Curated annotation (Swiss-Prot):
Full protein name: Mobilization protein MobL
Stated role: This protein is essential to promote the specific transfer of the plasmid in the presence of conjugative plasmids.
Lineage: Bacteria, Pseudomonadati, Pseudomonadota, Acidithiobacillia, Acidithiobacillales
Annotated family: Belongs to the MobA/MobL family.
Alphabetical keyword list: Conjugation, Mobility protein, Plasmid
Region span, Disordered: 130-149, 212-253, 300-338, 358-378
Organism whose genome encodes this protein: Acidithiobacillus ferridurans
Basic and acidic residues composition bias: residue spans: 130-146, 212-232, 241-253, 358-370
Length: 378
């Protein structure tokens, strides 16, 4: 049964990933990371049907040497090293036809974007007896040669270098056309949107060429009006556990639990929608009263703000009056000190005065004392 799947994701150092580790896992080989000294050994992984490193123009390179070069080329600690594309291959095709389709698509990607494309074809996951007991209606196929049951998910991983590559393997600048952030700023389609359509056309052309009526559709279930629970990928750790033990991983159980919770929420949502329609009618009847309440609230708020503004203006006026009175009192005190100084100078120059002058001086001292008394009263 031909199914459509194409996804893209970055492999970056900020997530603790490496180009060497990703390439070793997809190809099922051993690669030593020269930058960190880590040995990525996936030679016992199994299920890798074919792997091939393709350079622009159809050239090739040593996988370990090339991806170590990519690691050395990117200096930043949060650098995106690889853009990975994962595709599902039509089960209707033969092994050689699937290989030709995946390798041809990887070669087209390398030439289109001027990057390296490391493609690896993986076999489908084995379906165990326990899984069939638990989910008897799940899709599975049986290999006529080996009798092995599998889920029919023939797929391929294509690692695209995040930088441009020359036909001789020389690394260049960042391949911005693979960066979704750059595509968004440039207002152009991102990598996934472009390649979903292209891969669908390429896979359908292969199905037609080999005489199969089945076709795939790159559109999502939602856009096609199909209500279906989307599939989830386990990832390398959980998939490895299932291969080694033959038991379902905890991650698979988590996915199933999440799916059941989403179905329960959807059912509850249907009930809520029916109830909400009744509430909408009640709210419509209350809308007139609500508008009046909002208008009254706004009127009271405006009244409070106006009273607050008046209070602040009165406070500023009182403060200005206090400052003016203080300035007047300070000036009066200064005038008094100046008069006392002048009188003291006169007395020093004329220690003996007549009766009339003495009377005038006494009157002046009396005025100064009275002025001081008024100043203290303020």
């Amino acid at each position: 049964m031909a199914i459509y799947h194409l996804s893209a994701k970055p492999i970056s150092r900020s997530a603790g990933r490496s180009a060497t580790g990703a390439a070793a896992y997809r190809a099922g080989v051993e690669i030593t990371d020269e930058r960190t000294g880590l040995v990525h050994d996936y030679t016992r992984k199994g299920g890798v049907l074919h792997s091939e490193l393709i350079l622009p123009g159809g050239g090739t390179a040593d996988r370990a040497e090339f991806w170590n070069g990519v690691e050395a080329h990117h200096k930043r600690g949060d650098a995106v090293l690889v853009r990975e594309i994962e595709i599902s291959l039509p089960t209707e095709l033969t092994a050689e036809q699937r290989k030709a389709l995946a390798v041809g698509y990887a070669r087209a990607l390398a030439d289109r974007y001027g990057v390296a494309a490391d493609v690896a074809l993986h076999a489908p996951r084995t379906v165990t007896d326990r899984e069939l007991e638990k989910h008897p209606d799940q899709y599975h196929e049986t290999d006529p040669k080996t009798g092995r049951r599998h889920n029919g998910n023939w797929h391929a991983h294509i690692l695209l270098s995040a930088c441009h590559v020359q036909p001789d393997g020389t690394l260049g600048k960042k391949a911005v056309e693979l960066d979704p952030i750059h595509c968004q700023r440039a207002k152009i389609e991102n990598l996934v949107d472009r390649e979903r359509v292209r891969w669908g056309e390429l896979a359908n052309a292969a199905l037609e060429h080999h005489g199969h009526a089945a076709r795939i559709d790159h559109r999502s279930h939602a856009k096609r009006g199909i209500e279906a629970e989307p599939t989830r990928h386990l990832g390398p750790a959980a998939a490895g556990i299932e291969r080694r033990t033959g038991e379902e991983s905890r991650r698979r159980h988590d996915f199933e639990r999440e799916a059941m919770e989403r179905l329960a929420r959807a059912q509850a949502q249907g009930v809520l929608e029916r109830e909400s329609r009744g509430l909408e009618r009640s709210i419509f009847d209350l809308s007139g009263d609500m508008r009046a309440a909002f208008q009254e609230r706004d009127r009271l708020r405006e009244q409070q703000e106006r009273a607050e503004r008046e209070r602040r203006e009165q406070e500023r006026a009182r403060e200005a009056q206090r400052q003016q009175e203080k300035q007047q009192a300070d000036k009066a005190a200064s005038d008094q000190r100046e008069a006392e100084r002048i009188l003291a100078q006169l007395l020093e120059k004329a220690p003996v005065v007549d009766r009339k002058t003495e009377k005038a001086i006494d009157g002046l001292f009396h005025d100064i004392a009275r002025s001081r008394s008024r100043g203290r009263g303020r």
